[in-house]
Amino acid sequence: MNEVKHDIKALSLEALMALINSYGQPAFRAKQIFHWIYAHGVTDFAQMKNLSASFQTLLSQHFTVSSIQPHADTVSHEITPEQTVKFLFRLSDEQSIESVFIPSDSTSRNTLCISSQVGCAFACKFCATGYMGFIRNLTIGEILDQVLWVNRWLGDQRGGKITNVVFMGMGEPLANFDNCLAAIRILTNPDYAFQISTRKITVSTVGFIPGIQRLIDTGINCKLAISLHSAHQAIREELIPIAKEYSLATLKAILTRYNQAYKQPITFEYSLIHKINDSEQDAILLSKFCKGINCKINLIDYNSVDNIDYLPSPEGHKQAFIRKCIEHGLTVTVRKSRGADIQAACGQLAIQHVHGKKFSKIQTSRHST
């Protein structure tokens, strides 16, 4: 029986150094391997010219350099009119994840939205991924491979490379903290080809308090986005079940500490859902919650998901909500929904490609406007 090969990028530098020592090689070989992968983008041990042929062979017998591949049985990237691109990747265990490339209309900024888990344990009611349940965490290598693969594609197809990374794909990144942190450290390492500053990395969380505290403790000054979606406790509990464990008051307290540690605004993501969270009273509650927090509001046009009984807010409701927020001193941006037509926008990561799971129509409550 052939030995199952593992992705060498799943190892931290320290773990790889220990492994290299166990092979009777000097520990600095680990740094050479990392340099080949992350500075030069090689995908084969045979390309690592300063390693002996025998050592290259030994590594190739036990490890691979790349752990993801685009799906062969589906369109791995589909071009929309705005040139948003969805990538569907197959992992070594036949699970699937998605990444979304979002170019800027007016600048050279190239943003990649990446996944951190297969599925998600937090079961947000408006999100297709939440109905998958949690399958597993992504490894360090699987997280980084999304950036490596799209960088190669981008260089071949359009020129340039990824400049911004947002952990807003499948999964809760702060529930896969160690692997996401290790990936961020590599993405921001000036010795490697990514050369992405921490200010251009955004970690989005549903409000997982232990993870936010760990993020504060690390000193990693990346941007923080909170999937808030309501400042009404009962409504937020309906939308985001973890809110039953971590209340809005608890969330506000930890975000105040985050503001004290990092002098940059927190982004509150707010999907406007008709008759759920889009009334003027909802806007007033949002402004009260935000008082005392250095923050901005990113309003999102809700993208309808098959079999989930939520609807996007009508334009009139949206504009009234925005006006009320501005009246109360909030900084508001509206995220252009780019990629909904290819099931790539928030909440649209294609559940059917992950493990063929279907879910029945979800009934949701309605709140008066």
UniProtKB/Swiss-Prot annotation:
| Cofactors required | [4Fe-4S] cluster
One of the GO biological process terms: rRNA base methylation
* Residues that, per the record, bind S-adenosyl-L-methionine: G171, E172, S204, S227, L228, H229, N303
Q: Which InterPro entries match?
A: Aldolase_TIM, Methyltransferase_A, RlmN_N, RNA_MTrfase_RlmN, rRNA_lsu_MTrfase_RlmN/Cfr, rSAM
Q: How does the cofactor bind to this protein, according to its record?
A: Binds 1 [4Fe-4S] cluster. The cluster is coordinated with 3 cysteines and an exchangeable S-adenosyl-L-methionine.
UniProt-annotated catalytic positions: E98, C346
Query: What is the protein's given name?
Result: Probable dual-specificity RNA methyltransferase RlmN
**SUPFAM superfamilies from the UniProt entry:** Radical SAM enzymes
Query: What protein family is recorded?
Result: Belongs to the radical SAM superfamily. RlmN family.
